[in-house]
Amino acid sequence: MMKRIFKNVKLEKGYTCIVSPKNSELKYIEFGRVFLPEKNDEYAGETGNREAVLTIFGGKCSIQVETATQKVSYNSIGYRRDVFSGRPTMVYLPPNVEYRIIAESQVEIGVSMAPSNSSSPPILVKPEDVMESQVGAWNWKRTVYTSIGENVKAQRLLVGETFNPPGNWSSYPPHKHDRKSPSEVPLEEVYFFKVKPPNGFGLQRIYTSPEDEEPFDEIFLLENDATVVIPRGYHPVVAAPGYQLYYLWVLAGEERKYGAWSDDPNHGWLRNCEPIINEVLRF
């Protein structure tokens, strides 16, 4: 069995790959981080035959992009100190572009990639362009920011962020997106976690449906900077009391369709209760 959680990955200056099809069950997604510790530090990269999404976790930078037909500069982007300080700034990059990141302070950036034939231009998704949703109810209520969704004509990638208040659940009721049906499409997923304060933790259970040919049921200890690979199965998350939990989520598959998932039938009844609970708690 291949590894599904990656922790204590040393962050080097420049790009550090964390998960990819080479070291996991993933078929499409590669995820890593760019770290530039000092102002004026630079990193140069290229997308090749993949599309990419750059997520500024914290710090400020400029990003220069060169395609076959144009040059684009996104100057002084990223305003939050860390992921808990506001909405994200993300940049979508199509295949076959070169890009350069120039730090204007210490900066940390998530890099999500997947094979693509997209002809979309590069796109800057600013904090004010992000779709914000309050999802769930009671102790499974959380905030979800969708940055790379229908607003961007990517071929495969869907990218956003989720924030769990202390003690709260997310990806709940448990859902999955691992088979083709009228309501579900197969999408693999990667979660990258941050915890506030950083000595805190959360837990994630990943478990398959009864009809899965290779069933598994695992629980992972989520600590700051942990990365979890979700090849299939239900995958709920909970934050420990006293600690905020954040995760970047990255989805990719043959068909790109956000929200095409199915709930665990044992727990799906909770979704029907959410409007009632939210109405009661409003008073």
What do the predicted segments below correspond to?
Residues 84-104, 114, 221-242:
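Conserved metal-binding segment of the jelly-roll/cupin
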Residues 107-148, 205, 243, 248-283:
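Double-stranded beta-helix
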Residues 48-75, 93, 166, 178-224, ...:
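Glycine- and acidic-residue-biased ligand/ion/polar-headgroup-sensing regions
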Residues 95, 103-105, 111-115, 148-149, ...:
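Short, structured patches in soluble enzyme cores that scaffold and shape functional sites
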Residues 215-227, 234-263:
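Catalytic core of Fe(II)/2-oxoglutarate
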Residues 2-78, 276, 283:
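N-terminal non-catalytic cap/leader segment that marks the start of a structured domain
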Residues 11-44, 51, 140-190:
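A short glycine-rich, His/Asp/Glu-containing loop-to-beta-strand
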Residues 120-126, 156-160, 168-177, 202-206, ...:
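A short secondary-structure junction signal
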